[in-house]
Structure formats: structure tokens, C-alpha cells
Amino acid sequence: MDSNENKKNGGDSLELNIINNNNDNNNNNDNNNNSTEEHIESVEQSIKEFNNVANELETEFRDYLVETHKNDVNNIKNDIEAPPSGEFEPGGGAEDEDFKLRNYFKQSKVDAIQNGGKLKKMGVSFKNLTVIGKGADQSVVSDLATPFTFLISKLNVKNWFKKSKPSTFDILHDVSGFCKDGEMLLVLGRPGSGCSSLLRTISNQTGSYVDVLGSVTYGGIDQKKWDKYKAECIYVPEEDTHYPTLTVRETLEFALKCKTPSNRLPNEKKRTFRSKIFNLLLGMFGMVHQAETMVGNEFVRGLSGGERKRITIAESMVSASSINCYDCSTRGLDAASALDYAKSIRIMSDTLHKTTIASFYQASDSIYNLFDRVLILEKGRCVYFGPVGLAKQYFIDMGFECEPRKSTPDFLTGVTNPQERKVRPGFTVPESSAEFEEAWKQSEIYAQSCQEQREYEKLIEIEQPSIDFIQEITEQKSKSTSKSSPYTTGFFVQVIALTIRNFQIIWGDKFSLISRYSSVLVQAPIYGSVFFAMSNSIDGAFTRGGAIFSSILFNALLSEQELSITFTGRRILQKHKTYAMYRPAALHFAQIITEIPIIMIQVFLFSIVTYFMFGLDSSGSKFFINCFTLIGFTLATNNLYRLAGNLTPSVYIGQNIMNVLFLTMMTFTSYIIPYHQMPVWFGWYHYCNPFSFAFRALMGNEFNGLKFDCIEDAIPKGEFYQNETFTPYRSCATTAAEPGQLYFTGERYLEKSFGWEIKPSTQGFIAYNICIVYGFWILFIICNCIVLNIIDWTSGGFTCKVYLKGKAPKMNDVENEKQQNLLVQQATNNMKESLSMPGGLFTWQHMYYSVPIGGNTMKLLLDDIQGWIKPGQMTALMGSSGAGKTTLLDVLAKRKTTGQVQGTTLLNGKPLEIDFERITGYVEQMDVLNPALTVRETLRFSAKLRGEPTISLEEKFKYVEQVLEMMEMKHLGDALIGDLETGVGISVEERKRTTIGVELVAKPHILFLDEPTSGLDAQSSYNIIKFIRKLADAGMPLVCTIHQPSSVLFEHFDRILLLAKGGKTVYFGDIGEKSKTLTSYFQRHGVRECSDSENPAEYILEACGAGRHGKSVVDWPQAWKESPEYQSICQELKELQVTGSSYASIHVDNGKPREYATSLTYQTIEVYKRLNLIWWRSPGYSYGTFIQSALVGLINGWTFYNLQDSANDMNQRIFFIFNVTMLGILLMFLVLPQFITQQDYFKRDYASKFYHWLPFALSIIVVELPFVLVSGTIFFFCSFWTAGLNSDASTNFFFWLIFMLFLFYCVGFGQAIGAVCINITVALNLLPVLIIFLFLFCGVLVIPDQIPHFWKWVYHLNPCTHFLEAMVTNVLKHVNVVCTTDDLIKFVKPSSFSTCSDYAFEFLNGSNHSVSGSVQSLGGDNCGYCLYKNGEEYYSKLGWSYDNRWRGFGIIAGYFVLNIFLVVLFVFLTRKGKR
């Protein structure tokens, strides 16, 4: 029996596992007596490591068992009657590190068995697994030309008869293996080897692949039947996706609420269970003190990267799955924390029979020895699978040599890399992955593995663990959950948990909520004052419609932000779906519950102000009906925007769709076009529109029972007609009144003006429309639930590379593989020739950094840090996660923009100059890369703008190619960087390499690197460290934070700055040959001796107490202050500050520092070219704008089809142009996300002094203009002539010209809003506040004469006013009005007057007033009054003049220039992101 089998069997009996532990280990050694001496030492080291873990964690439990079971330790009853369980209480009298994890898990197992629980012993077996992916040539970068090339290819007759078979390649090729329950399988391989794909395939996430061949079984259950148990085999990706505004407690407690099982211990309440597990997780990962800290992300301050990784792992553990697939889960963790994490998994696997499959980059020997088996992949092919103790010797026997102090995992992955491996003399080794695979399949270990797999599968057939597994799964589910459901808790419980979480998210981002309500409170008085105290006259009837219509628009515009919010949580939803935490529909119901009180408050805040300021009916019932209707309408609109987000892959497409819907719904509300005047082909849309039913309900509610008086405005009008004898012969100036009546009712106004059927009951009409509004809400809820369950726009962690057309490399080609290896070797060898790095001396002394944590309290993050870097030196910055390494780098690199920094930093003995950020490179931990560019384009952009101007462009590009080759990215040069959320682009580790490349190609003089090897495999890390070592040798000083350095990597560094938690120095000084100087310092303070085979980096972290279980009796910061090394450092630092000027100056141009390497003109050209390329490669954004303009143009044109010369058509012309105005206003919402996204990338570039802020501000305005020009022209051609606005060429040209200028203005206005706001949510709250002044005060919703005097200045300053005046007068100038019968105001003449004209003579020609229009005879005594003779009379009543057209054009042009100034100003003010 081998060591792995013993390890597994040890988990079957609690007592035997503990009492016989040493016997098992002895057996392990006996079983390997036939191995080589080196192999024996390896196994012994593995056993020693494991025993250390076991002894450390189970001492208390062993003692207790010996005393309790001394009579019969092998009696199973004693196993059941183990000591009572106790909950771990972190911080409760003992430190977190004292918690005995194995004790807890074993006791939990005993308790579960005692209460009838079953162990979920589910191993996994996979045979002949081949995963087929889409060939690289099948995915090309999309741009604006893509639709045309596609259309041309389809029109080519030759292509009709070709059967093009899409190219594919094997991501995995014929891979077999297994992992028994209670075992741990380590998957190793270089990037692109298929490690992640293997883990995804095992966890049944195969939707991204073309095909999957072979079989995967889980404890005897095949993959097809496993879907309903998907939560029992989870895939944990390497990236961390969490809601940044939630705290650690809120994040984990939510997961626990969704995964709380029903079969808990007797009398154990859910709250107790969750508290116990929560405390356990905090103790396991040493996060007790961070429980109330926000998780954060790259934009929200919170946990450190390593701490965030721990939360990701803890969240996955909450799922309590049987099989766990961890993909590079130690990324961002320091070596001690990574080892603690691996130990925890080992203990869980042993005690709870968890099956663990993990892929680690840069795993140490300590971690490696905790695993049972290892599977090594190279280019998708298995080159080894078997016990971890035999892997190293297998490759040594093959002919490879392992360097001293090189970890086994590094050696195993390095043998496949010609640049890293070393071949023993006299041996011939495989060259390609296919040759490695062939050698493996011919080995004896392969035959043994196949035999063992067959035996394991037979054992599964006999034992049938799936029976106990299914029974346990069933018992874990709540009573409200069906047996076939993969979810643990019921739908109702999920909704409650999600609702609480949603409120916590909102509370965590209080600023957005406050800005939302502030927006309401600012806008409500403005709306109220515009329609203040409306009278019960004809004008009051019309303005009531405008007031109610504006109330609808206000709440609809606030719903715009729901679209962007929908996209922020997609990846988190996808992750939780794979964990089976909750149904997507539950998330939507929780969002509904959450938004109801928020929207109720929003509507009441708005209505309580506007309703009574409007002067609407003061009846209490009518007020509450008004609020109730608006609440239902806003809920429906919110869900409509959310539906658009769930149905579309990007925010730009969703925004375009909603802009089209918004304009059409607004148009067919009945306010702009009355229902009875809508064209037949669009009449149906009135009934598919929540806007229209809300408007009908609100209008019916207000006008019910109202009576409008029109004595003063009756027709004919004048003193002559004031005699009571003429009263029967006058009529109200509206079609709603009967001839001879000087009043009209609200119900009749609605019937005549809008064509609505109010009878038989107005109350029934109101109730019917309110029900329809809420019906829309319910309909959208159902649609969202269906869409969320069916459509998934995320990639599930899978990335698909896309290349420039014709640039895709060959996949898994042996010759191509060999050629790539040769290029890397040549680039590495030749790199030294091109390196010449004049560096400088950089010193820092007494550095303190503190941040405010509430009130006047400051938290100290860096405490008296000092040191230096000299030319030619590599300094490692190390410490446990959260010790302040990144913070220190930010401070030294002058990246901090918040908090207080104290201390002295000098360059060559002088204060830092303005060019410091430019001449220093800073590789940040977060990879902020523009997704629309390729890797080569990104690196070239950095080289062009940051390289010295004296270096030719050809030399810069040549250096870029060398960096690409050295970093093994030559084949990725033309690959799109892409976006992880959509799964299109390069992988996480490839992004890291690109981020490093961006800094390296600039040839910085000082280099700061924050975790440059985090998430990279050993070979990539080795290449990068070796490369920056060459940089140091060439004269560059650099500081590099590093979490998990191997012994080989650590030896490349000259000095180390070691930090303890709290930002205090533990050690700063030389490392020494073989780290002797460093280790001797710690040994002098009582730490054990570091062996020659031990990793010094792990040794010093262990010594200073890093990690969860780390302990140290020495106060290392204090010991450092009292050490002679510290005194020597202080003295040398003083000398360096004095003699620093003797170091070579790093400035050029006669020593004058330059903030930027290139001129402002050159920067502007390059930035514009890059932005233009981004826009060109954003067809979703650009074509979305074009399609939006075409659809809106067509709908607008056919809605106002072939307008005639009637008086009503004069109104329709006005509203046609008003819709044109609204198109421009909605365009502002479209440009916001794109601008804010690009501004985030600009801030990263600006921090490194790529370019000045002015080129970005100007370029991002100019780059939009051609696309806006095309969009506006499309709209013009689709709507102008269709609507019947055709006139002479000059009129048409002026219409197009001022329309283009207005769109330019709108884009600039939207960008100015984006520039001043910190995020998209705030921008979407602010924008409605500002656009209210545009559409509300333009003279359409409220005619100029009725605008309150206080707001007249807004009307005159409003650019929309001048735009509408110019457009309307331009269109109506030469139109003669011919009234139809329906247009006429009908009245009866007295019989004493012979004609209608005689009766109306005083009215039309009176000396005291001038009246436009004309009177017609309708036969007999019936007369009709036409309001206007021509278009000029129509717009002159608004105070507009045709002569003001070009003045309006100039005013809009002036506003456009003002917007440019504002964009430039706000970009300048916000150019530095908060750090």
C-alpha cells in the first residue's frame, strides 16, 4: 500500500487516523525502499512536512482522545461518543492561530455521524478527455468594416458552393486521471497548457467549448446526470469577483444563508450554525480583524489583494461541495498564507473526504508535498500523472537535472521549457509536447496509473458511494426545495437573503443613494415652479397635460441608471449560479423588493412638492392615486431597463435599444400625438406602452370632475362681444367645448383632445389604466426571470482569444512550438546588448502614511520606513498580506492622492522633480488595460509616448518585439486584450505579462513592481525576474514586492525590505550569498537555522510570524530598531543623502527635467489615433448609434408621415422637431459609459505620465464628432422627407447643419457630465437634473408666455430654445395653413349678421388687439375660426422670429465651445484618481 492509499484510509476511522499516524508514516517509508536515495529523501521530507501540520493542529484533540478512549480506542462507539463540539470563537481569549482545525473538522464529522448524517465520498474519474476549442482564425477582431466584409463574402458566388469547416484545435488531448475522495490532485502546467480547461471540464462548465470527448464520472454518476448536483463540484476561478461595497461579514453571511443545510445538529438554530461556520472561516484565513472591512476592488478602497483572495476561497468553502476545483487560488497570497490555505484543504480532505483538484502557479515544496497526486500538462497533453513522490524522479530518470534549491513544482513545469530545463550529460530528452506524451504512455508509472484507475472504478461500482451521497444531498435540502433542484435552500429563503444583501450593497454605496434623492429634491421644485398654480382655463387644461407628461418623463429618466447597474453584477451572478446559491429569478425578486421602498420614497418626495405646486386637484384620494400610479409606472420602467440589460451583451447596445424605446414610448403617450391622430401602422404601439397607460390614468385622475371656464378666451373675443346677448354665439377656443358653451368638462376634454373613451365610468377608466400599468410591471418581472434563467452573457471564467484578421497563430503545431522556443531563447540572449539603463540613487527616510477612518481619526498604515535603492540593485519588498507593501510602493512612486504622507524622498540627493513619474515605471497589481487594443499596440503606445524622443520609432518598435519574444508573447502580439467579463481576450496571467511589458518597453530609470509574478507560472515568473535582473545589471535600480518567491527567484535579489503588519520594518539590508546575511540576522534573534534545501523566503516569513498559524515571540520591529544593522542603515542613509549628487544624472536636455517625453502636439496626435482605433473597434457602440439614429429617424418620419398644412399639422411639426431635440438629449446618456470608461484608462496613463491631460480631453471630443456626423445624417435622411418637411435646398441644408451642431453640443455636454462624476451611477443621477433645463424650458411643454417670470432667464439661456426657434422658423416660414373641419373653433353667428365675417369683423380687426387666423362659413349660421393663416403667425405667438435663425446657430456653436472648455476643465480637475 503506498503513502497515498494510507493517507486516504486514514480518513475512514478517526481514532486509527490519529493513533496510527506514525505507523502509517513508517509504512510509507518501507513501501519506497526500492526507490533511489534521493526519492527516499523526498518522501521523508513530504512525511515530515505533513506530520508537522498534523502535530501542530491536533495536539489537544489527541490528548483528549487518549484520556477519553484509553480503554478501547478502536471501538466505533467511542468514535460516535466523541467530546462535545464547541464553536470556535476568534479572538475569544486566544489568538486566531491557536485554533485547531483538524480537531474541529473531526468533531464535526463525529457529530454528523451520530445524528445519522452520511459522508459525501465522491471522487472523480476522467478518461480519454479531449476538449476541442474554436481555432484562433475563427475569431477575428470586429470593427466597423466587419459587416461589409461579411456581406461581400456572402455575395461572392464562389463561396456559395464551398463548405467551409471551422478550424478547431485540441485544448486537451486524450487526458486521463482520477482523484479519490479524501485525496488532493495537483494540476501543473505552463500557461496555455490546459490546466484551467481541465478544471472547468471536471466541474462541468463546458459551454464555451466546441466539443468535449471522453468521459467524466463523479462517484459513479456520469457527467450528463451530474447537472442537478452542480453545486457539489465547483470551479473557483483565479479572479476575485465580489460586490466591493459589502463587508467581509456581509459577503460570507449571505453565502451562508443560501447554503445552510436542513440536517443540522439537533436544536442547532440556523443563526447558530451560520455564526459557527463564519467564525471558523475567519479563523482559518486569519481575517478576524477584517470582518467589518469593505471587500473593495481596484476602484473602491477595501481589502488588500491577498485578503480579497482569501474571501474568494472562503466563499467557495461555504458551498460545502464534495469536489472542489481551485484554479490558481493562491494568486496574491504570500507564501505563508498560501501554505496555510493548502494545509486547511489537506485537513478538510482528510477528515471530511473532500476531493480537491487544484492548479497552482509557483507552488512551494511545502504545498506540493501536501498533495497525493500530480498531473502535469503541456500544450493540452498529459506528460505525467501519478503520486507526487514519484514525479520528480520520473523526469530525472528521463534525463533532466534539478538545480539545488529549485522547488519540485518549478522543476516539473520547467522540464517542458527549453529555456529553463537542464539536461544531464549523455541523455536525449523529448522536445515537443507530443514526444513527452509518448514517453509518458510508454512508462511503467503510466501502466500502474491506468491499472489503479480501473481498480478504483471497480471499487466505485461495488461500494456505490452515490447512494449515500444522494441521500445526504436530499436531507440537506429544505422542505420547500424539490429533490431534483441543485439548490440547498428554498426560493423564499433565497429571496430574503438576497433582499438583505441588496440593501447592504445600497447602504455601502450611500453616496449614490444620496445623490439620487438629492437629484429628486433639486428637480421637484423646478418642475413645480414651471407649472406653478395652473388655472382652470383653456391654457390650464393644456399645461396640466404638460405637467403630468413631465412627471412621467422625470421618473423614466431616473430609471436610466438601472441599465448600467444591471451590468455590474453579471459576473457575480454567474459565479453564484455555478455554486447553486440561488436561482437567478430569486435575485430579480429581491431587486424588486429592494427597489419598492426606494422608488416609493422617490415618488413621494417628487409628488409632495410638485403635486401641490402644480395646483392639481387637492383631494387626498387623487393625490394618492397619482402617487400610486407613478410608483407602478416607475417600477415598470425600472424593470424594462433591467430587461434591456439582461437581453444585451453590452451596455452600449442596451442603451441604444432603450433610447429608441424611450423616444417611441414618449411619442405615443398621447401627449405629443393624440391617440385618434396616430398613424394606423403605429396605433398598436399605444397599447404596448406603459407610458401611455400611465398618462391616461394620471390625466383621468386629474380631469375627473373638473370644469374649465373660458369666458375670457371665448371666440369671438373683444369688448364688442361682452354683451350678454352675444354669449350664446361665442365658443371656447378648443374643440372640447360645444358651440355656445363658455366652459367644458375635464371628461369631454379628454375625449375630444385625445380620442379616449371615458364612458361609462371615469373611475373605471382610471382603475383600468392603473391595472394595465401594474400589469406591465408584472410582465417585465416575468420576462426578466425567464431571461436570467436562459441567457448568460458571461464566460464563466473562460477566455477566447481574438486576433487581427490573418494574424492568428497556428495552434498546437509541433514545428511552431519549436520555433517559438527558439525565439524566446534568442531574445533572452540578445537582450543584454540593447540594455543601457542610466539609473540614480533613490532614498526614502522616515516615511509615514495615514488615512482618515472617520471624524478626525487617522489610521497609520506606514510607520517610519526608510531605505534606498542604488543603480544595479534589486530590492525585494516582502511581508504578509496586508502588511503595507502596495501602500509603500504607492507612496514611493508618488501615486497616492489621498491620506497624509510624511517623510523625505530624494533622487540623487535632491528633491524629486516633475519628471519623476515619467522616468519611473510602476507595474501595478491590478491590470488596467484598454480592452479594444492588441497586446502589440498597447506596448507600442507606451514605447512611443514614454521613450526618449532621441530614440527612433524603428528602434522603439524593435525593442517592443524583443520584449514580446522574451516574455513568450510574440504569438499574442496581435491578440485583442479584451474583457474578462465577456470572456473575449487574453487570460489573467497574459494580462499580467502585458502590464509588465507596458512598463518595460518605456525603459524606465527606476522600476517599481507590485506583485509582477502574482498569478504567473514558475517559468513566466522566472523569465520576468531574470529579465528585470538584467535591467538591474544594466544600471536600473528597482523595488519589487513579491509574495511567493521560489528559492531560485529569491536568489536574484540583492536586498530585502521586510514589513510586518502595521507597516513596520522587520529588516532592511543585504540578502547575501545563499541568503546567509539575511538568515543569520534571524538566527541571531533565536530563530532556528535555515537548512540548505529550505526556501529562505518562506523561512523569514515563518520566522516573523506571517500566515494564519504564524507565531513569533520576538517583537521584530522593535528588535530591528535596537539592532546594529539599523544603526548602520541610518548612518549609511545619511551619507548617501550627502553624496547622492555624485550619481549620474538621469535627466536629458542639458539636465532640465521634462514632465513628458514627447511634445504636446505629438501626444495629441497619438492619443487621437488610439481613441479613433478604439471607436473603430467598438461596433457595438458605433453601429449602435447608427442603428439608433436610423430607427428613430424612420419611426419619427413615419409617425409624422406626410404632414399637411392644417393647423393641427403645425403642432405636429413642432413635436417632430421636439423629438429631434430629445434624440440629442438621449445621446448624452449614450456617451456617458464610453467616456467614463476611457477616462479610467486615462487616469492610469496620466499617473505614469504617458501624456498630458489636454490631449485626452481634446481627442475624446474630436473622436466622437465623425460618428455623430454620420448618425445625424442617417437620421436626417430617414425622417426629413418622410415627414413631408421638404422645401427648398437652403431650408434643408440649414436644418441638417444646425441639427449636426446641436448633436455636437449634446455629445460635449454628456462628456462634461462624465468628466466631473466619479462613476456612472452618479453621472446618471446628475444628468437628469441638468437636462431638465433643456427640455422643460424650451418653449414646447410650457409655452414662453406661461413660463414663470423667475425662470425666464433659463428660457433665454437654454440652447434648446435657440435650436427649436431656428428649426421651427426654418421649417414653417413658407407654410400656408389650411384648416380642416376638425381644426376649426366652431361658433354660431346671430341672425342679425349676414355673414360670419361680418360677425367676426371686430374680433379680427379690432383696434385694441391683433388677431391672427381667419373665419370661415360652415353653412347656415355655423361658423368656424382657423387659428392661423400661415406658419409665421404660428411661431410668432411663441415670440420666435425667422430672422433669429443664424443667431441661434451662433449661440449653439458658442455652447459647444463652452462644453469643450468644461470637458477640458473637468478632466484637469479629476485627472488624478483616488488612491
From Swiss-Prot:
* CDD domains assigned: ABCG_PDR_domain1, ABCG_PDR_domain2
Q: Which ranges carry the ABC transmembrane type-2 domain?
A: 507-753, 1180-1404
Which residue intervals define the domain ABC transporter in the entry? 155-404, 842-1087
| A molecular function (GO) term | ATP binding
Name where it's found: Membrane
The source's superkingdom equals Eukaryota
Keyword Endoplasmic reticulum attached:
no
Bias (Low complexity) occurs at 17-34
* Compositional bias (Basic and acidic residues): 1-10
Offer one example of a GO biological process linked to this entry. Answer: aggregation involved in sorocarp development
Q: Which residues form a coiled coil?
A: 25-67
Q: Which residues cross the membrane?
A: 596-616, 623-641, 653-673, 680-699, 770-790, 1180-1200, 1216-1236, 1256-1276, 1293-1313, 1323-1343, 1449-1469
Asked if Transit peptide is a keyword of the record, the answer is no
**Chain positions covered by the region annotation Disordered:** 1-40, 75-94
- Provide GO CC annotations from the record: membrane
Mind telling me which InterPro entries this protein's record contains?
AAA+_ATPase (IPR003593), ABC2_TM (IPR013525), ABC_trans_N (IPR029481), ABC_transporter-like_ATP-bd (IPR003439), ABC_transporter-like_CS (IPR017871), ABCG_dom (IPR043926), ABCG_PDR_1 (IPR034001), ABCG_PDR_2 (IPR034003)
- PROSITE patterns xrefs: ABC_TRANSPORTER_1, ABC_TRANSPORTER_2
Q: Where does ATP bind?
A: G879, S880, S881, G882, A883, G884, K885, T886
Supply the alphabetized keyword list: ATP-binding, Coiled coil, Membrane, Nucleotide-binding, Repeat, Transmembrane, Transmembrane helix, Transport
Q: Which Gene3D superfamilies match?
A: P-loop containing nucleotide triphosphate hydrolases (3.40.50.300)
Q: What is its main location?
A: membrane
**Membrane topology, as annotated:** Multi-pass membrane protein
**Family classification:** Belongs to the ABC transporter superfamily. ABCG family. PDR (TC 3.A.1.205) subfamily.
What is the official name of this protein in its record? ABC transporter G family member 15
Q: Which organism is it from?
A: Dictyostelium discoideum
